[in-house]
Amino acid sequence: MPLPSMQDQFAALIAAPSVSCTQPSLDQSNRAVIDLLAGWLGDLGFSCDVQQVSPGKFNLLASFGSGPGGLVLAGHSDTVPYDDALWQTDPLKLTEVDGRWVGLGSCDMKGFFALIIDAVLPLLDQPFKQPLLILATCDEESSMSGARALAEAGRPLGRAAVIGEPTGLKP
């Protein structure tokens, strides 16, 4: 199946609910986001390992190439809870407003995954000396259970990492 355009990937990720919250009534599974990413990355030749962290909660570690070291492009697949009444647009629909794409998770941080898939596409037909790893964790917005599960699994990750979390350019 052909890879959707970056904008279509972005829209699909935004449309997939994945609220993480300590209040059970608001908490949602992130499986739909993980399935989208694993499908696209798998079609590109990545080896995809989906780790169930708890019921309905999953991490994805996708690797291209093999061996020690490498680069990890890391982010989380969940969003904060939202109130429809506080949005001027549908939070689960990618919408262009004043030349910017908006939607729940567009910046923090589902959009990161669409951007990195687009960025690495031209590199995938070249041999890699070390692996490229794409990591999507669950529950960063609430309990950090995805990151904890990854650490507890003890799987070595790359030598360097880029974390796509927005910072407001503050270290």
Residue ranges and their predicted role:
Residues 1-83:
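N-terminal helical capping/dimerization or prosegment-like subdomains
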